[in-house]
Amino acid sequence: MQRRTPPPLSSRPAAGGFTLIELIVVIVILGVLAAVALPRFTSLQSDARAAKANALAGSIRAAATLAKSTALVRGSACNASVTMEGSTVTMINCYPTGDALGIIVAANISATNDNVTLSYAAGPPTVATVEMIGATTLATCRVTYTASNVADTPPTVAVLTGGC
């Protein structure tokens, strides 16, 4: 009986890691997952901008009411400025004006901190517009404050979120 000799051992170590096919399959799977997740992530950003616009509108309404209450409590004239938390707020018809010295100060809105753009239209009535940066259409993702033209008539606050 003859003995069989085992095949010689290779001096080359066994290769480790992924094969090219495995790597391509993983990349394809990650690409499919990214394609599915991206629209959902974009939708979340749009919802967040719309929620931010609604929150700013609520803040503006509350600030206008608070400014009027402050003026009434202090016995100020309807067109006199009031001081709120150390800042002077210009008033017209017992409510903040629609400019940088009125409702923007009263609501403590900052273009830098709130990631918005601010624009104003001279009146009467004065109008302040707050647009959400990053919106697909700025004209339809904004809050507009229109100061009152008539004494003791509240200002109007309009919210547009269609283009957020």
Indicate where each model-derived feature is located.
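C-terminal region of N-terminal signal peptides and the immediate post-cleavage residues
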Residues: 38, 43-50
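Membrane-proximal N-terminal amphipathic helix
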Residues: 48-75
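N-terminal leader/signal peptides at the extreme start of proteins
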Residues: 1-16
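Structural signature of extracellular appendage/secretion-system components
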Residues: 30, 42-43, 54, 72
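Alpha-helical hydrophobic helix detector
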Residues: 24-39
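Short, intrinsically disordered N-terminal pre-domain segments
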Residues: 3-4, 40, 162-164
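Periplasmic/extracellular, small/polar-rich flexible segments of pilin-like filament-forming proteins
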Residues: 69-164
